Curated annotation (Swiss-Prot):
Belongs to the oligoribonuclease family. SUPFAM superfamilies: Ribonuclease H-like. The gene is orn. GO terms for molecular function: 3'-5'-RNA exonuclease activity; nucleic acid binding. One of its GO terms (biological process) is DNA metabolic process. It comes from Xanthomonas oryzae pv. oryzae (strain KACC10331 / KXO85). The active site is at Y132. This is Oligoribonuclease.
Length: 194
């Protein structure tokens, strides 16, 4: 358990797997979280939870999601699960409460705005646990792709498409980009013309 939850620089990393990308119609089927320190060292892994849904819900997914979630094993885990959205939210909030105070961490991950939209609708208490800011690794990836393609191309994800593996990938990807950010001179202010 955390010795002091107030005023820390810990980061909450999260990933969701969903039945699709439509935040009004689709649903969260898996959630995982990791807490790191500011230097991206893993402090704790939260519960990795498949959320119960009926077979009809899974069969209604598009082909990509059906194939991916069967291949990863998530399909069967969802069918076998007894965990509801409310239980997954409560377990995740309880875990986070041991490591970081509410409102202290931005929501961290890849394409995290999409996760935030799903959380707002289906797990609003958990969504409110985060600071309003996001630490979205995909923003850095998009900038690197345009400004430093060799840096962007130097990282390969595992692409397992499970929530926990995707959280780990996000942390590792930011570690990759951080190597190149050191070339900026740390805390040294940069001169900007204009």
């Amino acid at each position: 358990m955390a010795e002091n939850l107030a005023g820390n620089d810990r980061l909450i990393w999260i990933d969701l797997e969903m039945t699709g990308l439509d935040t009004d119609r689709d649903s969260i089927i898996e959630i995982a979280t990791i807490v790191t320190d500011a230097q991206l060292n893993v402090l704790a892994e939260g519960p990795e939870l498949a959320i119960a849904h009926p077979l009809e819900t899974l069969e209604a997914m598009d082909e990509w999601n059906r194939n991916q979630h069967r291949r990863s094993g998530l399909w069967q885990r969802v069918l076998d699960s007894q965990v509801t959205h409310a239980q997954a939210e409560a377990q995740t909030v309880a875990f986070l409460g041991e490591w970081i105070r509410a409102g202290a961490s931005p929501m961290c991950g890849n394409s995290i705005c999409q996760d935030r939209r799903f959380l707002h609708r289906q797990m609003s208490r958990l969504e409110r646990y985060f600071h309003y800011r996001n630490l979205d690794v995909s923003t850095i990836k998009e900038l690197a792709r345009r400004w430093a393609p060799t840096v962007a191309n130097g990282f390969a994800k595992s692409s397992a498409h499970t929530a926990l593996s995707d959280v780990r990938d996000s942390i590792n990807e930011l570690r990759h980009y951080r190597q190149f950010m050191g070339a900026l001179g740390g805390d040294t202010a940069m001169d900007v013309e204009g």
